[in-house]
Structure formats: structure tokens, C-alpha cells
A protein has these predicted regions:
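Aromatic-lined, polymer-binding surfaces characteristic
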Residues: 4, 9-181
């Protein structure tokens, strides 16, 4: 399926937006505020369904490293708030899938395709995975690589006047959010 061909497949960004899993962050926050396990059950249901329908590196949800990065960042928040309440088998699978996101990012960085805001988001996610999961085999590499890329992007994307080089308020806000993260 030529999923990046708008004329043949429609707007792939609609699919990507849903698959950033920002709604799972909201479910995790709802659980954190209420302790209502229905929110956790819904997270598990969504995650298991997603894993089944989106095997590692197959399909539209693996076509953009930036989208993989956004999803990884969402999953990090979900894990941070709910990981201690996950069943052991689900938790193990969750961490395996999150690790795969890191592998995908490491080997598919947008260095040549879109080495600006895309690369920045990917680098932030890679760095976060390296810092927050220090026991993983590639953590130290991800931490160093991600941090180095973030610092490089800070130098190349921020002008002397402090504004983002694309002169877009949206990209300025996006880059600032990523640098702060």
C-alpha cells in the first residue's frame, strides 16, 4: 500500500496523529488522579491491540521516525505513571516494545530526510530512552547520541536573536518544547 501517496491512500497524518498515543497519556493521568483501574485496563487493551496490528517496522506507523519518537515519548509517560501497576507479562512486553522504538530511532534518524525539527524530536526521544532506562543494552549509546544531536540541533536551529531559524512561531514553540524536555 503506497501509504504516503495522498492521491491513492488519503492523508497519512490522520493515522499518525492517532498513533502518537497521546490519548494513552490522558488515560494514565486519569488513573493517576482517580485510581480507577478501568483506565489502566483501557491502556492495556489499546496497547495490546496496537502491538498486534503494528508489528515492529511494518506498516505506516513505522514509516516516520518522528512519529515513532512521539509515540515513544507518550509511552514513556504512560510507563512512568502506571508501570508499577502493570501485570508482569504486560510490563515485560511494554518495555520490549519501547526498546524496539529506541532501536528504530537509532537506525532511522532523519539525518538526511528532514534534519531539523524531525531530527530534534527523534533525538529527544532517543536521549529520554537512554536516560530513563539505563539498564538497557543500548542506553548509554542512545543517551550520548540523543544528547549530541539535541545540542547540534540547538546550534543549527536557534538564530543569534534567539528565534527558530524557520521563523515560524509553531516551529519555535516546538523546538523550545523539545529543548526543555
Amino acid at each position: 500500500i503506497p501509504y504516503l501517496d495522498f492521491a491513492r491512500s488519503g492523508d497519512h497524518k490522520v493515522v499518525w496523529e492517532l498513533n502518537r498515543h497521546q490519548h494513552l497519556v490522558l488515560l494514565a493521568q486519569a488513573w493517576l488522579l482517580t485510581s480507577d483501574d478501568r483506565y489502566l485496563e483501557e491502556i492495556v487493551r489499546h496497547m495490546e491491540s496496537w502491538w498486534e496490528q503494528n508489528p515492529y517496522q511494518h506498516g505506516i506507523n513505522w514509516a516516520s521516525a518522528l512519529e515513532v519518537a512521539f509515540r515513544a515519548l507518550s509511552w514513556i509517560w504512560v510507563y512512568h505513571w502506571t508501570g508499577h501497576r502493570m501485570e508482569p507479562d504486560f510490563r515485560r512486553r511494554f518495555l520490549e516494545e519501547l526498546y524496539r522504538h529506541g532501536l528504530h530511532l537509532e537506525f532511522n534518524l532523519s539525518i538526511h530526510f528532514s534534519p531539523n525539527t524531525h531530527l530534534l524530536g527523534e533525538a529527544v526521544a532517543l536521549h529520554a530512552l537512554g536516560v530513563l532506562f539505563p539498564g538497557w543494552p543500548r542506553s548509554s549509546r542512545w543517551r550520548r547520541l540523543g544528547r549530541g544531536l539535541v545540542l547540534d540541533q540547538m546550534d543549527s536551529q536557534v538564530l543569534a536573536d534567539g528565534f527558530h531559524f524557520e521563523r515560524s512561531p509553531y516551529y519555535h514553540l516546538y523546538a523550545t518544547d523539545m529543548f526543555v524536555f
